[in-house]
Amino acid sequence: MKKTKNNLPFDPNGRIFQWGPVPGKFFFCSMFTAVHYKHFRAKYKENWSETLWLFLNGRMFWVNDLNDIQAAGVKVFLKYLLPLKTHKKIYKEWQGYTAKLLKLHKNIDTADLTKLTDTQLKKMWVQYHNTYRDFWVTSSIPELANYGSEKYLKEKLQAIIKNENELMSAMEILTAPTRISFYQEEEIALSKTDNIKKHQQKYFWLKNSYAGTEILPTEFFAERKSKLNKNLETEAKEKIKETTAKKIAIQKKYFLSPEIMAIAQAISEGVGWQDERKKYIFMILHHENVMLEEVARRFKYSTEELYRAWYFEIEQIIAKKNLHAKLKKRKTGFGVRFFHTCKELNAQETENYWQTYETKVEKHITETKGAVASKGKTTKSQGVVHIVLDPNNIGSFKQGEVLVAPMTSPEYIFAMKLAGAVITDAGGLTSHAAIVSRELGIPCVVGAKGSTKVFKDGDAVEIDTVSGTVKLIK
């Protein structure tokens, strides 16, 4: 691991990549943490850049040096996602692991876990997580590639499109996915079904996240069905046709080469793959939690204790190892710093890193600037700010408000559907906020650093989707 002044992994005043802070529990993230520093490199001979992964007061915060993560992303993009044959081979392999997980889900659903012996429970846990590890190793390709591919495409286009606004508009169109998202898939299915109970059994996991799981009742789906547009499927298909036509128009307008179009297509496919992956992750989180609750019951742990454990530590608990003291130490804060190896961080180290890298803003600042991810219907729009730090707590969010968040993930979808515009502290043109805002046709500015601190609930703001500025209206 590299060192900067004061043994910091990255220069706090340099170019920093942040994911979060958002609600989350370490256990639900522990598999991909292990994959990112160890298993991914073992299979693909490439690795994530040095990372801080911090957990404090129910929230999680991921930090990288931006130049490093982009460089790592470009390598993986060029090696594994851009070559069509390689991309298809890895995607097919991932589909195989997904199919295995779905079979294991049926086993978990039909088993009475309380009647399994410790040996049987351990076997179930290990088999499940070995497959889940393989699922994550292969599907980390589009995620890591995403962090470098956008910059790579932009550099190619800059030689052709000199106007910055035209460049960003072309980027927005070229990187847009051309397949229906899993939330659209669920809404279309809901709009067409007459069997709400069957639909609930298929999609009960819809609001799961790394912060926790819940089983949604039939009432949740029945209420939403009554408000759905009956033409959802037709409109979604028309939107995809429109997106495809816009890509062709951009290619013709700027005489873009097949090479550039292939780069854009690979990025678009990677974004779609990540969305599909998230659907399965939500299902996986449920089944992990079902097994975890049995471990908690059987071995006299609280589930909150186990949410601070690595997935492989659960196997140790089943083998009768006492981890109460170890997990208690993580209660007030826990983190990891990893590259080729992984160092666990205590509460004090975690808090110090958090304070060092969390975005700070001057009190007099009344404007932020980011990348325009979706123009919406007009180049300038106004609205009232509603800051959402927890996507599972949006009860007071009103139709037409401006959603301001650290970043968005699929759990934010229900607030985004009400929003008049979306502003995020972090993210790029291929981020979740960007993709969903385009689907909804609302203005979106991503990577507007510090927005959740500059603005407060009730502020009136103006969003300029030409310049990417968000201004407080006095």
Annotate each PLM feature.
Residues 1-474:
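Non-catalytic, soluble scaffold/interaction modules
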